[in-house]
Structures are given as structure tokens and as C-alpha cells.
Swiss-Prot record:
Pfam families reported in the protein's UniProt record: Methyltransf_11
EC number: 2.1.1.197
Task performed by this protein: Converts the free carboxyl group of a malonyl-thioester to its methyl ester by transfer of a methyl group from S-adenosyl-L-methionine (SAM). It allows to synthesize pimeloyl-ACP via the fatty acid synthetic pathway.
Gene: bioC
Name under which the protein is recorded: Malonyl-[acyl-carrier protein] O-methyltransferase
Length: 267
């Protein structure tokens, strides 16, 4: 069962760019296209919350930036919006197109959005910007393509996410094998140039065993590491060692996601 705690944060600049292999990330998510929806419990929960933050906005054109399989593209469309689905992973975008979830489909990078200035009313990006090399560049692009009076909605992961898994791997072989996520303060810094509001929440599902935990990551394509190594399912002996090293809580194996929800107002 997931437990959630939350509180509001407001932005307080240059952020260090991450070393991100975009082609490898796109390939990892393309491979996960068929399994993604059945495994994406966290993405569904965060996405629905993000939609609630902006669904009263009267704007008509929505950009779903990092659309994945298009689950939320379809959700916005059912709310009467015209939806542009954008993703870096060709496999994900092809799957979304097959499901006919949007009005237009764009293969592209959030940090270099292939749209003219001021072309959408709502820019929606659920759990995608943590894969960017430069959060500031992504937010700048969101702001550029959004019309004045529009709204930008994004969610991302902050430092501390997947920490239990990283600590367990450290016990096994001295390496964490999980991605590093930006500290909350760095996310606040990236938002400081805009009128905005940030909210944080802790999402902490528990799993019956380490294999189920690792499969939850593999099913959504999230086993790719920023610096290039894969952290997918391992051999039996390594998984057994990982399970021994993993600290149980309340009869399960927890995995923390430190969520950040952002709303930026396009002035």
C-alpha cells in the first residue's frame, strides 16, 4: 500500500547538466511500450493528480510532452481538448498513434520541442523531465511553446527517489545502480524565473519481494541509468544477494518516490 505525505514548496542560478544518453533512453522506453500501461501505477496516480491541477483551465490545445503510450493524451481529449502527443521514443509514439489517443503526434525531445512559439494553451508533462539533461532547458521550452495566459503542468522525481534500492545494491557490490535525481532546491532554482507553485509528495509502494520490485521498474522502461549502464533484472545469485541486503518495512520491500508537482503560469 502506498503512503503519501505532502507539503507545499515555493521556488527560491545554473544547474549542472546531467550526462544523459537520449538514444538509450528512447530505446529503453520503446522496448517497454507494450508492457508500460500494465506496470505504470505510479505514472497513473501522479498523472491524474497533475490533470486535476489544470483541468479547470479553459485552454483548448494541450501538449502532452513525454506522452508515453498516450494514456493522458486520451484523458485530455475526453475533456474536449485538442491534443498534441510528443515523445522521444518512437516505439511509445507508434503505440500511442495505434491507440488513436491524440490529434497530432510528434517525435521529438522535450529540450528541443518541434513546435512554434506560443502554439499551445496547456503544456502537460507527467514524469518525463527527470530524463532530461537540463531541466532549465526543458522548462524554458515549455514556456516558449505555451501561449500567454496558458499553464504548464509537470511532475518529476527528486533526490531520494529509489534510495532503498540504491542502498541495497551498495551493500551487494559497492555501486548504487540507480539514477541520481535533482535535489528539490535545484528544481526550485530551475523554476525561479517563472510565476509558479511546487508541491512535494512521497509515494512509497511496497513489494512482496525484490523480483517484483525490479519488474515494476523494468515494465515501465525505467531501468536505464543516466550514465549508460542498465540496471534490469539480474542473475539469481545477485538478486538473492540484493534481497538479503534490502531492508524490509511492514512486511514488504519499500521503494520511495519523492514526487514534485509543478505549475508554471505563462505570463
Amino acid at each position: 500500500m502506498a503512503s503519501v505525505t505532502e507539503h507545499a514548496q515555493w521556488g527560491v542560478g545554473c544547474l549542472p547538466p546531467l550526462n544523459v544518453d537520449k538514444q538509450a533512453i528512447a530505446a529503453a522506453f520503446s522496448r517497454a511500450a507494450e508492457s508500460y500501461d500494465s506496470a505504470a501505477n505510479l505514472q497513473r496516480e501522479t498523472g491524474h493528480r497533475l490533470v486535476q491541477l489544470g483541468q479547470q483551465h479553459t485552454g483548448f490545445v494541450v501538449l502532452d510532452a513525454g506522452c508515453g503510450t498516450g494514456h493522458f493524451s486520451q484523458h485530455w481529449r475526453l475533456l474536449g481538448k485538442r491534443v498534441i502527443a510528443l515523445d522521444l521514443a518512437a516505439g511509445m509514439l507508434d503505440y500511442a498513434r495505434q491507440q488513436q489517443v491524440a490529434d497530432d503526434y510528434l517525435l521529438g525531445d522535450i529540450e528541443h520541442i518541434p513546435l512554434p512559439d506560443q502554439s499551445v494553451d496547456i503544456c502537460f508533462s507527467n514524469l518525463a523531465v527527470q530524463w532530461c539533461s537540463d531541466l532549465g532547458a526543458a522548462l524554458s521550452e515549455f514556456y516558449r511553446v505555451t501561449r500567454p495566459g496558458g499553464i504548464i503542468l509537470f511532475s518529476t522525481l527528486a533526490e531520494g527517489s529509489l534510495d532503498e534500492l540504491g542502498q541495497a545494491w551498495q551493500q551487494v557490490d559497492g555501486q548504487r545502480h540507480v539514477n541520481d535525481f535533482l535535489p528539490l532546491q535545484h528544481i526550485q532554482t530551475a523554476c525561479q524565473y517563472y510565476r509558479h507553485h511546487l508541491t512535494t509528495a512521497l509515494y512509497q509502494p511496497r513489494f512482496p519481494n525484490v523480483i517484483a520490485l525490479m519488474r515494476s521498474l523494468q515494465g515501465i522502461g525505467a531501468t536505464h541509468l543516466h550514465h549508460g549502464r542498465q540496471a534490469g533484472l539480474q542473475g539469481r545469485q545477485r538478486l538473492a544477494a540484493l534481497q538479503r541486503a534490502y531492508v524490509m518495512q511492514s512486511g514488504g520491500y519499500p521503494l520511495s518516490y519523492h514526487m514534485v508537482y509543478g505549475v508554471i503560469y505563462r505570463d
